[in-house]
């Protein structure tokens, strides 16, 4: 009796098992190259209610154009709302001119005879302009209570809105944009070991404290019971030459993962650029100037992992004795020894996509026994 294969998702079990990459469909990634989630949430019960329960996070995550629109609408709305209340107070007290108040009548709010005047008084009170033309008299205690309530409520509202603005500006997200990952990962020998390498650089002079780079291998995994786990996550460890847990990220650094018998990458088709997996890289650290925790993310698909290449050296020494990091060389790679074969003595620089295409053409020509001359540019 054969067991029925099941597919497990985040919170949902379905009866159909589909690969991450279907034939003829462009390979999709869970995480974009700039670290944003590429997952769409659907069929969430009471989604709006859940967002309203956590207003602070909702407002901070809100895009700037909506935040500015909400900011303006909130202030204008409170001015108008309390203006209507002030107008109703004037109507109830008989302060309007069309009601024919007696000559010795003392209004609740002096010079408030129309809805426009009530709106202007509400605006002047809330913004503490205080022109002096419209003011509260001692005749109406209700007006005094209303003024206190308006100032207290609107002050709380201003504190909340201002706090969300400051929190959004101070988020370490913008600091994360000055941390750069290489566009491609490369596989070559390093210190006699086959390694998968990525390059990371800090483009600011201020440092990140306690940097750590971790990796997650995402792929479909089938258990012994026949269950297909969509996007199974496996840890992939990275280190620098010093094997330190906290590298000194003052210059562009290359992080290594040794592809040995214990590596989760050992059975993957890294050389062919094919396969159904995604390698997610996460760099975490503390911003030196603000002590806020910063996280930078990127991901690599199989075609973004280059076999038999190393990164071009991007650090040099100037005539004045200063180290220079040339970011025009940051993503460039050089053809080196093909892992498992002899070292190629010809050094080639250029665009990784072009190099990868030319290398595949060269290998195809060698298999057919024909001589093929491929010109590689230094662009």
Curated annotation (Swiss-Prot):
Q: Where in the cell is it found?
A: Membrane; Basolateral cell membrane
Tissue pattern of expression reads: Predominantly expressed in the brain, including in glial cells of the cerebellum and forebrain. Expressed at lower levels in the kidney, and other peripheral tissues.
Q: Which UniProt keywords apply?
A: ATP-binding, Cell membrane, Disulfide bond, Ion channel, Ion transport, Membrane, Nucleotide-binding, Potassium, Potassium transport, Transmembrane, Transmembrane helix, Transport, Voltage-gated channel
InterPro entries per record: Ig_E-set (IPR014756), IRK_C (IPR041647), K_chnl_inward-rec_Kir (IPR016449), K_chnl_inward-rec_Kir1.2 (IPR003269), K_chnl_inward-rec_Kir_cyto (IPR013518), Kir_TM (IPR040445)
Any single Pfam family the record assigns to this protein: IRK
Q: Which residues lie on this side of the membrane: Extracellular?
A: 89-114, 132-140
Q: What positions does the record give for the motif labelled Selectivity filter?
A: 128-133
GO MF assignments: ATP binding; identical protein binding; inward rectifier potassium channel activity; potassium channel activity; signaling receptor binding
Q: Which residues lie within the membrane without crossing it?
A: 115-131
Q: How does it sit in the membrane?
A: Multi-pass membrane protein
| Quaternary assembly | Homotetramer. In kidney cells, it forms heteromeric channels with Kir5.1/KCNJ16; this interaction is required for KCNJ16 localization to the basolateral membrane. Interacts with MAGI1, alone and possibly as a heteromer with KCNJ16; this interaction may facilitate KCNJ10/KCNJ16 potassium channel expression at the basolateral membrane in kidney cells. Interacts with PATJ.
The entry's protein name is ATP-sensitive inward rectifier potassium channel 10
Q: Report the source organism.
A: Rattus norvegicus (Rat)
């Amino acid at each position: 009796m054969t067991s029925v294969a099941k597919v497990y998702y985040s919170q949902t079990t379905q009866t159909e098992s589909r690969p991450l990459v279907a034939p003829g469909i462009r390979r999709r990634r869970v995480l974009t190259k700039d670290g944003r989630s590429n997952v769409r949430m659907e069929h969430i019960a009471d989604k709006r209610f859940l967002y309203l329960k956590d207003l602070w996070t909702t407002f901070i995550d809100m895009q700037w154009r909506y935040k500015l629109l909400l900011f303006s609408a909130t202030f204008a709305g409170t001015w108008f709302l309390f203006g209507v209340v002030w107008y109703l107070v004037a109507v109830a007290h008989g302060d309007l001119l069309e009601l024919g108040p007696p000559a010795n009548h003392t209004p609740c709010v002096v010079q408030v005879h129309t809805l426009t005047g009530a709106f202007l008084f509400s605006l002047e009170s809330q913004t503490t302009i205080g022109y002096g033309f419209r003011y509260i008299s001692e005749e109406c205690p209700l007006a005094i209570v209303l003024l206190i309530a308006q100032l207290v409520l609107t002050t709380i509202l201003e504190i909340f809105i201002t706090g969300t603005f400051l929190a959004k500006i101070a988020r370490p997200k913008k600091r994360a944009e000055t941390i750069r990952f290489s566009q491609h990962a490369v596989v070559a020998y390093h210190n006699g070991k086959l390694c998968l390498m990525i390059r990371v650089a800090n483009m600011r002079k201020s440092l990140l404290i306690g940097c750590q780079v971790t990796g997650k291998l995402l792929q479909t995994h089938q258990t012994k019971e026949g269950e297909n786990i969509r996007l199974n996550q496996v840890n992939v460890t990275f280190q620098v030459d010093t094997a330190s847990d906290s590298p000194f990220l003052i210059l562009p650094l290359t992080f290594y993962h040794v592809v040995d018998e214990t590596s989760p990458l050992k059975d993957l088709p890294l050389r062919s650029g094919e396969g159904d997996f995604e390698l997610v890289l996460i760099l975490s650290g503390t911003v030196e100037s603000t002590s806020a925790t910063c996280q930078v993310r990127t991901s690599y698909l199989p075609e973004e992992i280059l076999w038999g290449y190393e990164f071009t050296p991007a650090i040099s020494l100037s005539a004045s004795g200063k180290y220079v990091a040339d970011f025009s060389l940051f993503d460039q790679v050089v053809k080196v020894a093909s892992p498992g074969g002899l070292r190629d003595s010809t050094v080639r620089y250029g665009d990784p996509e072009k190099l990868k295409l030319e290398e595949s053409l060269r290998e195809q020509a060698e298999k057919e026994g024909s001589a093929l001359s491929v010109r590689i540019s230094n662009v």
